[in-house]
Every structure is written in structure tokens, then in C-alpha cells.
């Protein structure tokens, strides 16, 4: 693409527009600058709310992939890629999902997480190669993230995923975007021009983070990773998380602290198993069998056998 064509394209992208409410921001004192930023941030939640129907469709697609043994793959460049990685890596400790069930890809690879990699976002071949390296298949769901909706790395990945017959989702902040037109599901949070023109790490990045939170969290709830609003599949891999696991067992069962510790010890720190043991009186093996029979849904396992 020539520079003239690129300039023309950028002029048509909502996230690249100038914000008339912040034209004087460089003349303002600190508090007034912060108030301008905060005023713009208030628009983000409403923009995400307006995209709720498409976010719902995205969750349903991800749940379908998980139920078929597939994966959730995030793909982006720069801030968008880092947000995908951030969401992906938190799924293992929060929900004890297997490594590789939720994956974040960033243009330029691991180096690009902390350093800018020149030209990476324009590399269409890399977008395809990164998915091929994962043995991406029709069981998986690809979420392409780009505030502008035009990033070549992401667009190429979405096109390849469609060739694989996988479900594709675009997360962007620009109506009628390139990636939105490629993807099966177009999640577009129309946050408007940024406080600083084109700095999409601001409102656009915040909107993307909220959307990714929804996609992963709702999907995990739908596959039985929670009980009530408790993280009962928490991986108690450090002292803080173990203390949280104890609290979760106590909150779910109304038991004493010592009872929670003992149950977790017998259950090898498996929170669901410990809760089921306390509430139903079964032993460790029976608790695991009940959970397996109900595909890991604690609520269903607790009601098993009741009439």
C-alpha cells in the first residue's frame, strides 16, 4: 500500500479522528488534563454495552470450541497483542485450564511484548505462520484484535482461520473495518476519537480489555469453572492463591477454617473436590468421580442423585 493510500485509509478510521473536546489539552494544568481523560473514559463502558449482542455471539462460539476440545486464540499487534496475551496467561491460574487452551499471539513474537518490533504488524505472512505453528484447526476460535480494524498481521490471520473453517471474531473500535468484514462475528466498540489523536492504547485499549474480560470470563463460567461467583477451579500455586482457595472453600460451605484446610489437603488443593467433600460427605475419589460425571460442573455434581 502506498503512503497516499494509507493516509487516505487512516482518514476514514474512527479511532484515528481528532477529538474536538481535547484540542486545547496541551494548554491545561494537570488536573484539567486528567479530567479530560476521565471524561473520555466514561464513554468506554457505554460503547462496550452497545456491542453486547456481538459479544454474546462471541462467547457462544468460544464455548462451542471448548466443548469440542478446541482452543481460544487471541491475535494482535502492539497494545492489542499485549492485551490478548494478558488475558490468555491469566486463564491458567484463575481457572486451572490446561496450558495451550487459551493462547495469545503478538506480531513480532515474545520480543514484541516489551519492545516495539518494526514492521511486525504489517507482516501478513507472519500472521499465517504463527497460526500454522499452533496447528490451528476448525475446532479453534480466533479472536483478531485491532483498534483500527486494519492491521495486516491480524487480517491475514483471520483469513487463514476462515480457510481452516474455524470461527473468527474481530475485536475493534472502527465501524465497517477490514477485520470486521472478514470475521464471522464483528465486535466493534465505537469509543470515538482518542484524547491524543490515534493513541489507541487509551479508550480503544480500555474497551478491548473489557471485551476480552467478558469473552474469557463468561466462557469459563459457561464450561463450569465457577460455582456461584466463586473461582472454584483456582490453581492454588502460591501462598496468596492457597489462602484464597481456603476462603473460597469456607465461603462455599460455611465451614470453619480448619475444616477448609483439611479438605484442601486431602483434595490435593483441588477446590471443587474439597467443597464437594464437605457438602456431600463423599471421599476424594467419589468427589472426583461425581465431578467427572457432570463435566466439572460443581453445582450439578452437588445435586447428583437428588430428586
UniProtKB/Swiss-Prot annotation:
Signal peptide: none annotated. PROSITE patterns: GCKR, SIS. Pathway: Amino-sugar metabolism; 1,6-anhydro-N-acetylmuramate degradation; Amino-sugar metabolism; N-acetylmuramate degradation; Cell wall biogenesis; peptidoglycan recycling. The keyword Zinc does not apply. Keywords: Carbohydrate metabolism, Lyase. It is an enzyme of class 4 (lyase). It catalyses: N-acetyl-D-muramate 6-phosphate + H2O = N-acetyl-D-glucosamine 6-phosphate + (R)-lactate. Disulfide bonds: none annotated. One of its GO terms (biological process) is N-acetylmuramic acid catabolic process. Its EC number is 4.2.1.126. Residues 62-225 form the SIS domain. The active site is at residues 90, 121. A lyase-type mechanism (elimination/hydration) is suggested for the cleavage of the lactyl ether bond of MurNAc 6-phosphate, with the formation of an alpha,beta-unsaturated aldehyde intermediate with (E)-stereochemistry, followed by the syn addition of water to give product. HAMAP family: MurQ (MF_00068). Homodimer. This is N-acetylmuramic acid 6-phosphate etherase. It comes from Pseudoalteromonas atlantica (strain T6c / ATCC BAA-1087). The gene is murQ.
Amino acid at each position: 500500500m502506498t503512503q497516499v493510500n494509507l493516509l487516505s485509509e487512516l482518514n476514514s478510521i474512527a479511532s484515528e479522528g481528532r477529538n474536538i473536546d481535547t484540542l486545547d489539552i496541551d494548554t491545561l494544568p494537570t488536573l484539567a488534563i486528567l479530567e479530560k481523560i476521565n471524561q473520555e473514559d466514561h464513554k468506554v463502558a457505554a460503547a462496550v454495552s452497545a456491542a453486547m449482542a456481538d459479544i454474546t455471539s462471541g462467547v457462544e462460539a468460544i464455548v462451542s470450541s471448548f466443548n469440542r476440545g478446541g482452543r481460544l486464540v487471541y491475535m494482535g499487534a502492539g497494545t492489542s497483542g499485549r492485551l490478548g496475551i494478558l488475558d490468555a496467561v491469566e486463564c491458567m491460574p484463575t481457572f486451572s485450564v490446561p496450558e495451550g487452551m487459551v493462547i495469545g499471539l503478538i506480531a513480532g513474537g515474545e520480543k514484541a511484548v516489551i519492545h516495539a518490533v518494526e514492521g511486525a504488524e504489517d507482516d501478513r505472512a507472519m500472521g499465517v505462520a504463527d497460526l500454522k505453528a499452533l496447528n490451528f484447526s476448525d475446532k479453534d476460535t480466533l479472536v483478531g484484535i485491532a483498534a483500527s480494524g486494519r492491521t495486516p498481521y491480524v487480517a491475514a490471520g483471520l483469513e487463514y482461520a476462515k480457510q481452516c473453517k474455524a470461527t473468527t471474531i474481530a475485536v475493534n473500535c472502527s465501524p465497517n473495518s477490514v477485520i470486521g468484514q472478514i470475521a464471522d462475528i464483528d465486535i466493534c466498540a465505537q469509543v470515538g476519537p482518542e484524547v491524543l489523536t490515534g493513541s489507541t492504547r487509551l479508550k480503544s485499549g480500555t474497551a478491548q480489555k473489557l471485551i476480552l474480560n467478558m469473552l474469557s470470563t463468561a466462557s469459563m463460567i459457561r464450561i463450569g469453572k465457577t460455582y456461584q461467583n466463586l473461582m472454584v477451579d483456582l490453581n492454588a500455586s502460591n501462598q496468596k492463591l492457597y489462602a484464597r482457595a481456603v476462603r473460597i472453600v469456607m465461603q462455599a460451605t460455611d465451614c470453619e477454617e480448619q475444616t477448609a484446610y483439611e479438605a484442601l489437603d486431602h483434595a490435593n488443593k483441588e477446590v471443587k473436590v474439597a467443597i464437594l467433600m464437605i457438602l456431600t460427605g463423599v471421599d476424594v475419589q467419589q468427589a472426583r468421580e461425581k465431578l467427572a460425571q457432570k463435566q466439572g460442573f460443581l453445582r450439578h455434581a452437588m445435586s447428583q442423585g437428588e430428586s
